[in-house]
């Protein structure tokens, strides 16, 4: 009779269990399908079903019914797959059931039972989004403890590597795994397990191929020069053997666009490589990372450099070099940020010779590949800023070491004359340094700074600098140097070196002889001496330009003008002078008027002379002949409005074809003083005197006979009817 009063959800669950006590039971197919339909169509029933499954599984565990426990675990997996949208309702009950099974010593040593638990774990992880459960601390702790218990049972109780790797693979499939801080340790443990099992199955990746001693720059591993034709290194994405769960687990952790998950995996990889430094393993993993995210590997490598031991620092630097010199493609690498970090660590560890030298090797390897245009130029500029402009002369030995290393692998022309002059005293291979100069001649300002820098160099470096300048920039160096040494006319190594190479460049034997005499006597060339060599256009094609430089007053010159057809320049050769725009008393610049406005102002000032007061009075007092027009009655205020408007209309009519009237909103007319404005106004009055018959005020006739007939506003006046339609009353 008790069965008649059993709730429906319990009936449906019980009907899924086949009878008997055999251990290999399977849930009934049709009953299970109906149960899934029942819980899907009635969401409130899910909680009741999960609660009843907890109660029934507890009873089955106590009675050691392994067959029923197997059926329960399969039902859990099916419910998760079919009701994953409402997983938050039953997930805690399901984890509680599996935890009870794993803690029961009668069942946790059964591979079949643990395998069924792994299937439930897989179903949960496939549909679990970390961003949705990150706020439920109770569930996060419950799930973390369950996963830890699963790995413990699979590894220690069963010693089943595949079950362990399957658990790692399942856990890695959680969406937004990296956003859950509580699970980061578990995720890192999964990566470590997968790496260890991978190395056990593939011994080639388990040997230490990098030692912690300093590797000379000439060692084969670090001196490898990449060619244009490269063979792609096999990576995680190239492996087709899906039966190896260690590779599948590593692939899900590293072949992902989720940077948080990738960062967790890379932290575990770095820790693993410090224990067994194998560059092949590093390249294998990195080649499976999406190419646009591989730069993260280098960033995470350099981050712990400052806090690591000397042994680990050397290992990290060598691993970075091995990756930079490998065939693994990397894009988007922030080269300057990496360089700054390396230099900072190098300065902090300047007392360790091995670390300093290894960092120099890594800096060199950083420039073996081109990640963006102007990369080499930026790296040289950064070295100059860190060591030269920072004013720390006790670090110049480090600068020389880094500079020599960087120059040895740089082949593109990326240096300007400024950096060339700065680097020359510190470089060992000065010939290679000169090959890095830009082929285009720089601006004369750069030349002036270059010649100023040359004056501080040794005699040998001065000779190299001047000769290199003439070899690369020829006429630009000749004329710029001439302009500089005319103003700085004093004996020096640079002075004589310039004139020596200038005479060779011009091919003037007498000039060369005089240079040697002047050098011997510590004498200088006068302008008259130099004009002799720039006087004949037949023997010196630069004679005209040279004379301009020699004859100009350099105290206020704007620079020399060099023909660009003769010498190719990237920027004009003349030394620019800063021209300050005209300003008002408050410092705001005045905008000049356009040519049209200038014409208007000029023409408006060329009218008739200014009328006197008597003429104006006669003009106002004149009366129109009443026989030609009808009269209207109006007040004096109306008359004044009509008069003003008529002035404007007549001016536009008569002068519109002759004078371009400027829009005051377009250009500001400057330069008109009070007197000019008065003349302009009076000229307008003059123009009105020649209006047609529509004008209210007639021309002046017999002005001497009339006086001032001013009338008050309340008096009546006569207004011409011809103004009808042109009155704008306000």
From Swiss-Prot:
Transmembrane stretches in the record are none
Q: Which GO terms describe its cellular component?
A: plasma membrane
Question: What InterPro entries does the record tag this protein with?
Answer: EFR3 (IPR039786), EFR3_HEAT-like_rpt (IPR049150)
GO biological process, alphabetically ordered: protein localization to plasma membrane
A Pfam match is EFR3
Q: Give the record's family classification.
A: Belongs to the EFR3 family.
User: What is the protein name for this chain?
Assistant: Protein EFR3
Q: Which gene encodes it?
A: EFR3
């Amino acid at each position: 009779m008790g069965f008649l009063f059993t709730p429906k959800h319990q009936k449906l669950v019980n009907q899924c269990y086949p009878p008997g006590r055999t251990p290999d039971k399977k849930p009934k197919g049709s009953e299970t399908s109906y149960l899934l339909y029942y819980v899907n169509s009635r969401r409130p029933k899910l909680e009741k079903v999960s609660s009843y499954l907890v109660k029934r599984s507890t009873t089955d565990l106590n009675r050691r019914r392994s067959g029923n426990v197997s059926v329960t675990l399969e039902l859990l997996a099916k419910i998760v797959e079919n009701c994953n949208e409402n997983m938050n309702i039953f997930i805690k009950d399901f984890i509680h059931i599996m935890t009870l099974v794993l803690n029961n010593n009668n069942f946790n040593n059964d591979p079949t039972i643990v395998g069924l638990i792994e299937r439930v774990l897989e179903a949960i992880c496939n549909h679990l989004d970390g961003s949705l459960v990150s706020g439920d601390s109770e569930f996060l702790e419950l799930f973390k403890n369950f996963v830890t218990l699963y790995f413990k049972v699979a590894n220690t109780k069963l010693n089943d590597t595949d079950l362990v790797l399957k658990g790692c693979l399942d856990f890695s499939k959680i969406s937004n795994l990296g956003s859950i801080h509580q699970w980061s340790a578990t995720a890192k443990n999964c990566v470590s397990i997968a790496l260890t099992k991978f190395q056990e199955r593939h011994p080639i990746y388990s040997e230490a191929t990098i030692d912690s001693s300093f590797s000379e720059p000439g060692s084969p591993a670090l001196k490898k020069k990449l060619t244009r034709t490269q063979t792609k290194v096999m990576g995680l994405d190239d492996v087709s053997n899906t039966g190896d769960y260690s590779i599948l687990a590593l692939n899900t952790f590293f072949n992902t666009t989720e940077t948080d998950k990738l960062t967790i995996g890379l932290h575990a990889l770095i820790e693993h490589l410090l224990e067994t430094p194998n560059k092949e393993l590093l390249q294998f993993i990195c080649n499976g990372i999406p190419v646009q995210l591989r730069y993260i590997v280098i960033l995470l490598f350099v981050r712990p450099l400052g806090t690591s031991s000397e042994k680990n620092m050397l290992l990290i630097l060598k691993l970075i070099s091995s990756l930079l010199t490998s065939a693994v493609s990397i894009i988007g690498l922030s080269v300057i940020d990496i360089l700054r970090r390396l230099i900072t660590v190098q300065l902090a560890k300047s007392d360790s010779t091995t670390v300093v030298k290894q960092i120099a090797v890594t800096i060199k390897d950083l420039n073996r590949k081109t990640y963006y245009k102007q990369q080499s130029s930026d790296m040289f500029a950064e070295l100059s800023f860190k060591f030269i402009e920072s004013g720390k002369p006790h670090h110049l030995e480090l600068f020389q070491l880094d500079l020599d290393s960087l120059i040895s692998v740089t082949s593109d022309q990326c240096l300007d004359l400024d950096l060339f002059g700065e680097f020359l005293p510190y470089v060992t291979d000065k010939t290679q340094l000169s090959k890095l100069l830009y082929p285009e001649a720089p601006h004369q300002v750069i030349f002036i700074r270059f010649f100023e820098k040359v004056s501080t160099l040794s005699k040998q470096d001065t000779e190299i600098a001047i000769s290199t300048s003439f070899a690369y920039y020829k006429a630009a160096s000749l004329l710029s140097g001439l302009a500089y040494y005319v103003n700085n006319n004093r004996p020096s190594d640079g002075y004589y070196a310039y004139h020596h190479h200038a005479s060779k460049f011009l091919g003037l034997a007498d000039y060369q002889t005089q240079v040697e005499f002047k050098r011997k006597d510590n004498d200088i060339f006068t302008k008259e001496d130099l004009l002799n060599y720039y006087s004949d256009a037949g023997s010196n094609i630069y004679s005209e330009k040279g004379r301009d430089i020699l004859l100009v007053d350099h105290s206020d010159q704007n620079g020399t003008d060099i023909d660009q057809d003769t010498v190719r320049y990237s920027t004009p050769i003349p030394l620019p002078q800063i021209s300050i725009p005209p300003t008002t008393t408050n410092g705001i610049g005045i905008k000049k008027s356009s040519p049209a406005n200038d014409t208007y102002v000029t023409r408006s000032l060329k009218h008739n002379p200014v009328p006197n007061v008597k003429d104006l009075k006669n003009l106002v007092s004149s009366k129109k002949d009443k026989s030609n027009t009808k009269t209207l009655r109006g007040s004096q205020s109306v008359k004044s409005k009509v008069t003003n408007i008529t002035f404007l209309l007549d001016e536009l009519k008569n002068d519109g074809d002759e004078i371009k009237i400027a829009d005051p909103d377009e250009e500001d007319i400057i330069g008109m003083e009070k007197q000019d404005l008065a003349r302009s106004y009076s000229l307008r009055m003059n123009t009105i005197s020649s209006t047609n018959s529509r004008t209210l005020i007639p021309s002046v006739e017999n002005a001497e006979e009339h006086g001032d007939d001013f009338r008050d506003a309340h008096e009546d006046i006569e207004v011409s009817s011809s103004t009808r339609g042109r009155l704008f009353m306000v």
